[in-house]
Amino acid sequence: TDAATAPAGCEALFSETPWRLPRSAFVYRPLGQPDAVNALPALERGYITFGTLTRAIRLNQRLIAAWARLLQRVPGSRLVINSHNFSQPEVRELWLQRFEDLGIARERLEIGFQSPVWGVLRGVDIALDCFPQNSGTTLLESLYMGLPFVTLAGTPSMGTLGASVLTALGHPEWIAHSEDEYVDKLVALASDLPALARIRAGLRSEMQASALMDEPGFARDVE
């Protein structure tokens, strides 16, 4: 583990003693042949697209209520939810209805499944992490395609995976500690398209230069 995933003082939550690596508990190598990072879609479309590759098991009412608040605060924005679970019509309909119950028209939602994920991510401006259980590999895939995300740091360790990734990347400013702050940080990212375009253009290089993709360094840390 690492200090962001298992902060000092949380030892009582574990049955074993946490062994903290000095930089990151994660190291990433993209699978297959990822697409090149494209220009920010919102610059051409005129609206922000949020997106997540999470599985349905991570969705919950508290989480989608926060996402509904986010969509309400960013006019015209849309949400893409892409995972194999949502290839089932009954699962798609369940979550479409839950968003509608929160005041979000289904026309603003694209829930389904396409693979490989790289093409989906090329159409998204900002990635969404889940809580109280954070996403995992899909956060790294999103960053690799130039998409920033905000995480809500919760209970170690499944609630602090996003914080670990962002700390290793060098963007702790995208870590939130309350639901209000989570939404506020996402709104701030969505409200500055020139800055968001710069983030997208440089994020893959930042990631490649970080501990998240330093495989030899990770091996040395473990040794």
Model segments located where?
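Generic beta-strand/beta-sheet core signal
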Residues: 1-2, 53, 82-84, 112-114, ...
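Catalytic binding pocket for nucleotide-activated donors in carbohydrate/polymer assembly enzymes
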Residues: 122-126, 130-215
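Conserved catalytic-core segment of nucleotide-activated headgroup transferases in glycan assembly
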Residues: 23-115, 122
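Acidic, amphipathic alpha-helical patches
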Residues: 116-117, 162
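C-terminal amphipathic helix plus adjacent low-complexity
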Residues: 54-56, 69-72, 82-84, 89-97, ...
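Short, conserved active-site loop motifs that form the nucleotide-linked donor/cofactor pocket
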Residues: 18, 108-110, 172-173
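Active-site-proximal region of nucleotide-activated glycan assembly enzymes
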Residues: 1-35
